[in-house]
Amino acid sequence: LLIGLIRHGQTDWNLIGKIQGRTDIPLNENGRNQAKLLADRLARDMFTWDYVISSGLQRAEETASIIANALHVPLLPPDERIIERSYGQVEGTTQEERMTRWGDQWRERDLGQETNEEVRARAMQFLQDMSEQHSNANILMVSHGSFLAQLYLALFQERYQENIKNLSFTVLEKKDLHWSPILYNCTRHLEESNV
């Protein structure tokens, strides 16, 4: 079983550093182009993919749709377990606004955001269910930066600490009971095109 993990393409809020969380912001034109570049890469890749699944937020759904159409594979119904972390009061704020309102310890304050443990629990449940329901399939999952970061922490503890980039591609392989990264946070498809 392989799972390809993709962070959605760029949005206007990504450009200005606003936390999106569950706010349903669409891709911008650059984000759509990024998704097409990744789809082109996946069409030429050594792996074959059977399904694409995404969260229910439009930035992930549109990214997933572009990829599924290009690869001619089914797009599964959205799964709410892979939605971005809820950031509560922090959603829609820039770094400067967060610092002004709550100081540099805003992450430690109770501002209504979902905890790391809650995000990790639903991430691991999703992986478990996918490995049981689709044990002989290779699945592409389009999700969100904070969700993916927490998934990697749940699986690999502190080994992977890079910022998860828009349209980054990670491949995890499950052998026996263990997940191993074959590729991590790769954006080669964007760098080759300077997007």
What annotation goes with each model-predicted range?
Residues I3, A137-S146:
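Generic beta-sheet signal
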Residues D45-T48, M130-A137:
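Glycine-rich phosphate-binding loop signature in dinucleotide/nucleotide-binding domains
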Residues S54-S55, A121, V142-S143:
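Short beta-strand scaffold positions
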Residues T11, F147-L148:
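Short active-site segment of divalent metal-dependent hydrolases/proteases
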Residues L38-R44, V73, P78, E84-E96, ...:
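Acidic, low-complexity terminal tails and accessory targeting/binding regions
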Residues M99-E118:
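Short glycine/proline- and acidic residue-enriched helix-loop micro-motifs
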